């Protein structure tokens, strides 16, 4: 599937099973040939900033990972049956290279490496201002929700 116009938040909500406060994709700019470019706008209003860390707010690495996992599901657009959900099955080679703070725009890039028999893998990268914030491979299982 190739995306000609960006998916706005209402379209993202139709595609993902997640809801507030766990929707970590705000927009999908492109999907083509198993590759996705999506966006998470990071604001001070995120609930996790109250505790991580009150005097120096930093987006937790596990939530950057979750944002990449959610973006990865758009690599499968058109390949999943209605009612199927992608479940996180593993993470390989995760590296966190810079802090993500309020005001950052987190660009999420995912490339589908394979999808066979309900198991898949994406290579992912999160960037802020063109600088890599995190990179990893995400393994997932697709099953009925």
UniProtKB/Swiss-Prot annotation:
It comes from the Bacteria. It catalyses: a (3R)-hydroxyacyl-[ACP] = a (2E)-enoyl-[ACP] + H2O. CDD domains: FabZ. The active site is at residue 52. Pfam families: FabA (PF07977). Its main location: cytoplasm. One of its GO terms (cellular component) is membrane. GO terms for molecular function: (3R)-hydroxyacyl-[acyl-carrier-protein] dehydratase activity. Its EC number is 4.2.1.59. Keywords: Cytoplasm, Lipid A biosynthesis, Lipid biosynthesis, Lipid metabolism, Lyase. GO terms for biological process: fatty acid biosynthetic process; lipid A biosynthetic process. It is found in: Cytoplasm. Involved in unsaturated fatty acids biosynthesis. Catalyzes the dehydration of short chain beta-hydroxyacyl-ACPs and long chain saturated and unsaturated beta-hydroxyacyl-ACPs. HAMAP family: FabZ (MF_00406). NCBIfam families: fabZ (TIGR01750), PRK00006.1 (NF000582). Belongs to the thioester dehydratase family. FabZ subfamily. This is 3-hydroxyacyl-[acyl-carrier-protein] dehydratase FabZ. It comes from Deinococcus radiodurans (strain ATCC 13939 / DSM 20539 / JCM 16871 / CCUG 27074 / LMG 4051 / NBRC 15346 / NCIMB 9279 / VKM B-1422 / R1).
């Amino acid at each position: 599937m190739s995306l000609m116009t960006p998916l706005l938040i209402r379209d993202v909500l139709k595609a993902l099973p997640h809801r507030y406060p766990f929707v970590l994709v705000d927009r999908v700019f492109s999907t083509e040939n198993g590759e996705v470019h999506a966006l998470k706008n990071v604001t001070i209003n995120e609930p996790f900033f109250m505790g991580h860390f009150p005097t120096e707010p930093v987006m937790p690495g596990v939530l950057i990972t979750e944002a990449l996992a959610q973006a990865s599901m758009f690599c499968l657009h058109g390949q999943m049956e209605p009612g199927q959900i992608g479940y996180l099955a593993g993470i390989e080679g995760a590296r966190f290279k810079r802090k993500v703070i309020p005001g950052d725009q987190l660009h999420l890039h995912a490339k589908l490496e394979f999808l066979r028999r309900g198991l898949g893998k994406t290579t992912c990268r999160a960037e802020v201002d063109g600088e890599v914030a995190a990179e990893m491979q995400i393994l997932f299982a697709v099953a009925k929700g």
